[in-house]
Amino acid sequence: MPSPGLVMESGQVLPAFLLCSTLLVIKMYAVAVITGQMRLRKKAFANPEDALKRGGLQYYRSDPDVERCLRAHRNDMETIYPFLFLGFVYSFLGPNPLIAWIHFLVVLTGRVVHTVAYLGKLNPRLRSGAYVLAQFSCFSMALQILWEVAHHL
């Protein structure tokens, strides 16, 4: 339950952002854990000392599935970090709470679907569509932030 201070300052928007952004950060942690597990399962270690500890230098190598996990994680960093900034600032612009919820849920859903589609090697169109939807929502927030800033110059 959000504190009364958060609700008074920003209506229902900031708590909605905090919920969605926290879930996205947890999702990023999950991808990091999946990457580590994939390294162990495939015996593909990024550091020679890890390979030596796990059986020998022959395991100091790359693996396509590990690389896929790393790309998913990098894509998360390229998209979720900007959302954390944009969503936070957007929360204080006084947006309509329903519209803000939609923005945040579109990003959350898009990023989860993108990750599942990418790691699961599902249809690339599904992955691309999820990516575009999440980015569209971020772009919308960015434009609204710029609009508000321009009106206060």
Curated annotation (Swiss-Prot):
This is Prostaglandin E synthase. Its main location: membrane. Glutathione binds at residues 39, 74-78, 114, 118, 127-131. Pathway: Lipid metabolism; prostaglandin biosynthesis. Its EC number is 5.3.99.3, 1.11.1.-, 2.5.1.18. GO terms for biological process: cell population proliferation; negative regulation of cell population proliferation; positive regulation of prostaglandin secretion; prostaglandin biosynthetic process; prostaglandin metabolic process; regulation of fever generation; regulation of inflammatory response; sensory perception of pain. InterPro entries: MAPEG-like_dom_sf, Membr-assoc_MAPEG, MGST1-like. The record marks 50, 127 as: Essential for protaglandin-E synthase activity. SUPFAM superfamilies: MAPEG domain-like (SSF161084). Keywords: Cytoplasm, Fatty acid biosynthesis, Fatty acid metabolism, Isomerase, Lipid biosynthesis, Lipid metabolism, Membrane, Oxidoreductase, Prostaglandin biosynthesis, Prostaglandin metabolism, Transferase, Transmembrane, Transmembrane helix. It is a multi-pass membrane protein. Induction: Induced by pro-inflammatory stimuli and down-regulated by anti-inflammatory glucocorticoid. Residues 1-13, 92-96 are lumenal. Activity is increased markedly in macrophages and osteoblasts following pro-inflammatory stimuli. The lineage of its organism: Eukaryota, Metazoa, Chordata, Craniata, Vertebrata. One of its GO terms (cellular component) is perinuclear region of cytoplasm. It is found in: Membrane; Cytoplasm, Perinuclear region. Gene3D superfamilies: Membrane associated eicosanoid/glutathione metabolism-like domain. The chain crosses the membrane at residues 14-42, 62-91, 97-120, 125-153.
